[in-house]
Amino acid sequence: MPPTFVLASASPARKRLLEMAGISPLVAVSHFDESSLAADNTVALVEALAKAKAGTVASKFADALVLGCDSLLLVNGQTYGKPESPAVAIARWQTMRGQVGELYTGHALIDRTQNRCLCQTGLTKVHFADVDDDTIQAYVGSGEPLQCAGAFALEGKGGMLINKLDGCSSNVIGLSLPILRSLLQRLGYSLKDFW
């Protein structure tokens, strides 16, 4: 029997993705202070954050498989997480519109039964629509972008503001299902173990 699958995230979108893929996770929020970490580049930062979140939660379980994730958006050399306020979200959208961003999601999967941790980062290019200020104001006013890395939710209203994606769509939502499958297989698990 496989270990309990634990999602070290408060993200409803990540939980929903797992459930749609047939995995019913136990949710254990890490409450890790993301501002306590810094890194030289976006990939290193999302992996460090994912690993820290997974590690914080994994320490509470003796025999679980713990997944931590973190996403950041890189546009024109600037890295963005969740916007701190509506004003920041509006300014960010005014910068992002008509641009192509790179959405990075770090994944850390800790197997407490094997004392192993695997990390991998997904990259998806996001082509933002050249939306007008009224649309930006309305979108930010909906509240949706305030809880999302990059100030948009692909699976919500924000999906209407994206022209196209190059890469994995679930990565943009916060958890690349292909990466998760690969990490599980590298640890010796089959997908059917969790269905």
Curated annotation (Swiss-Prot):
One GO CC term, this protein: cytoplasm
One GO MF term attached to the UniProt entry: nucleoside triphosphate diphosphatase activity
This enzyme's EC code(s): 3.6.1.9
One Pfam family this sequence matches: Maf
Needed cofactors: a divalent metal cation
Record's catalysed reaction(s): a ribonucleoside 5'-triphosphate + H2O = a ribonucleoside 5'-phosphate + diphosphate + H(+); a 2'-deoxyribonucleoside 5'-triphosphate + H2O = a 2'-deoxyribonucleoside 5'-phosphate + diphosphate + H(+)
Active-site residues, record numbering mapped to chain: D70
Localization in the cell: Cytoplasm
Enzyme's top EC category: hydrolase
Keywords: Cytoplasm, Hydrolase, Nucleotide metabolism
InterPro entries: ITPase-like_fam, Maf-like
Domain of life: Bacteria
Single GO biological process annotation from the record: nucleotide metabolic process
Reported function: Nucleoside triphosphate pyrophosphatase. May have a dual role in cell division arrest and in preventing the incorporation of modified nucleotides into cellular nucleic acids.
Listed HAMAP family: Maf (MF_00528)
The protein, known as: Nucleoside triphosphate pyrophosphatase
Organism: Synechocystis sp. (strain ATCC 27184 / PCC 6803 / Kazusa)
